[in-house]
């Protein structure tokens, strides 16, 4: 029987998570994309601790962007997560695309985070 899109994404994400681990030296930049918003977290998997987070739900971004489901919103979240990570002393991360295809909003967030100074 054919998998649904959500089930296929979840199985891809489980496969990725077996390989991608965030450490205190190089934490994991996890991206979650919903229909209306995009979320990014920098996570230390050894301590099970979220170090930095940003999303398109944040008030300053919502006022500027309006909709959180656009590539412009993803770029803004990518810049914000890079800025917050740099402030927390994080330079290098491991990218976790969350089972999503590296295209569109996920790619826009990753490119903006790279431009903001994160190395991955």
From Swiss-Prot:
GO molecular function, one term: 5S rRNA binding
GO cellular component terms listed in the entry, alphabetical order: cytosolic large ribosomal subunit
Keywords for this protein: Ribonucleoprotein, Ribosomal protein, RNA-binding, rRNA-binding
Subunit architecture: Part of the 50S ribosomal subunit; part of the 5S rRNA/L5/L18/L25 subcomplex. Contacts the 5S and 23S rRNAs.
Summary of the function given for this chain in its UniProt record: This is one of the proteins that bind and probably mediate the attachment of the 5S RNA into the large ribosomal subunit, where it forms part of the central protuberance.
Annotated HAMAP family: Ribosomal_uL18_B (MF_01337_B)
Protein name: Large ribosomal subunit protein uL18
Species annotation: Thermosynechococcus vestitus (strain NIES-2133 / IAM M-273 / BP-1)
């Amino acid at each position: 029987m054919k998998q649904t899109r959500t089930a296929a994404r979840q199985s891809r994400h489980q496969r990725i998570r077996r390989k991608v681990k965030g450490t205190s030296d190089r934490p994991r930049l996890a991206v979650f994309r919903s229909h209306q918003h995009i979320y990014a977290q920098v996570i230390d998997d050894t301590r099970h601790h979220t170090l930095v987070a940003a999303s398109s739900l944040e008030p300053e971004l919502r006022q500027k962007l309006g909709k959180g489901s656009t590539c412009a919103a993803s770029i803004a979240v990518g810049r914000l997560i890079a800025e917050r990570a740099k402030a927390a002393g994080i330079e290098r991360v491991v990218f976790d695309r969350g089972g999503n295809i590296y295209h569109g909003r996920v790619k826009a967030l990753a490119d903006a985070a790279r431009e903001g100074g994160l190395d991955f």
